[in-house]
Amino acid sequence: IQRFYLLSCTFILKKRKTKVVVAMNEGKEKEEEQAQGRQELWDSLPDGAVYHAPTNPDDFFTGITFDISPRQFGLRVRKNDMYCELGGPRHRYSSFFFIEVVKEGERIEDGRVEVIGPEIKEIEGQSLPFGFWIRYYGKGLTEDYLDLLTRWTYFALEEGEGWMLLNTRDTIWLRLHKKYAHKHHFKHLGQAMINLCKIQFPLVEKADAKILIAREDLGGAARTKELIDKVCIPYCERVDERARTFTDEDVDTFYGCTICQTFAPSHVCVVAPDRPPYCGIITWIGAKVMCDMDPYGYIFEIPLDECVDPWGGEYAGVNEKVHEKSNRTYKRVVMYSSITYPQTNCGCFEAAIFYIPEVDGLGLVDRRYSGETPLKMTFSKLAGLISGGQQNHGYCGISFRTPRSRKFVRADGGWHRVVWMPAEYKQMLAEFIPSDVHDKIATEEDCVDASALKEFLKRVDHPVVALWRNGEEPEPLRIPTPNTDWDSEEEKVAREKGRKLKRA
């Protein structure tokens, strides 16, 4: 019997090991297939003007005449001061900034920068969709360093004289100030991006870039959207999926980021496995790598210490570090809430959560949506209202990835508290919305006015109706003004409402 048991266990273990190996091989095959597809798309792009950037470190910035320094960080360029605009809302955020780690060095011609389309001097006063595709290779370079590579590549724009950069990935938005336009060329921008990364990160051995300025004769926004769908999204989803294998319970350290304090002086972003940062640039894995590489930089460790509230995600260590790094402005952060002590808001968020008092529910809105919300304001107006480093109870910036989290606004009732969102955003997140509430969340196609939203929620029997008096009249929370504390009794009411939806 013992011999049979041992043989059975050995067979089961071998079978499991075989399954793991098969899964790994299938994942590797899929990754290689995607890499080949990306190379084919790279090669299929129209020919452009080729510039060979210096590859000798002594000459990395030869020819570049614009300043690159921290004092340039956080510039905002108003419409009247704009020389040109790339991406952004005029093109429904159909532009991209794509960073790729290439495994085969022979695919890259080091220092090659190809500008497909017009140069900067040819597009004064214009607004065009665009795509920056940057590739890096190094023997020790893996996708674990992707967030680090992305951040350092962005510095050519974020710290580049005259540039305004907002958002990331496929929602990127650039403007160039007319005062500094004479200093700039796209070829030198590509040179700055790849060589800044080489200086900061010696593992990078080779790099090249393609800059697509998508005029109509080059396919316009349709061309950049095709590249987003075929290149950016599959690559980023695979990387994000790996990041989601961790949960907050798996780690004893979160990470903080203060890079946005150049324009939001009291803002502190807390990066956790289940709570990606608003900007969408980094993950918990990326923050860990960046902190290990530069322990004295703007990314820092946050030891969790005692868990004050497991359901809401409040930790003594997070509160202490946020208080210290926010110039002692804020004392509490509840990680899984947008209503009670949410994280502060900078201005880089890809989407936002907002409280709708007329129905005692939450709404979502993303940058791509240009219409009004039930608050009777657009995303841009809402963003202007809640940004700047304030703690706005009931209003919180998020990244596109945040609603995919298992702990998305869990303390507020999770998805069962969400009552409205744009149709396109809802479709994007469909697989992450619980089936019992999906059809009960209104979009602009159903209603926008708060009174009409109230009737819609009653008609579909949305879970939030359980919070209303007799299921008929909402009892809105008395939310405190920004940067102030909750009344202790009202905070209890807010927390109990979240728990009630949890039990439901």
Placement of each model-derived feature along the sequence:
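Low-complexity, intrinsically disordered or signal/transmembrane-proximal segments
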Residues: 2-5
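Extended, histidine- and acidic-residue-enriched regions that form the cofactor-binding/catalytic faces
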Residues: 12
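PRPP-associated nucleotide enzymes
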Residues: 25-26
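Cysteine-centered metal-binding/redox modules
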Residues: 31-503
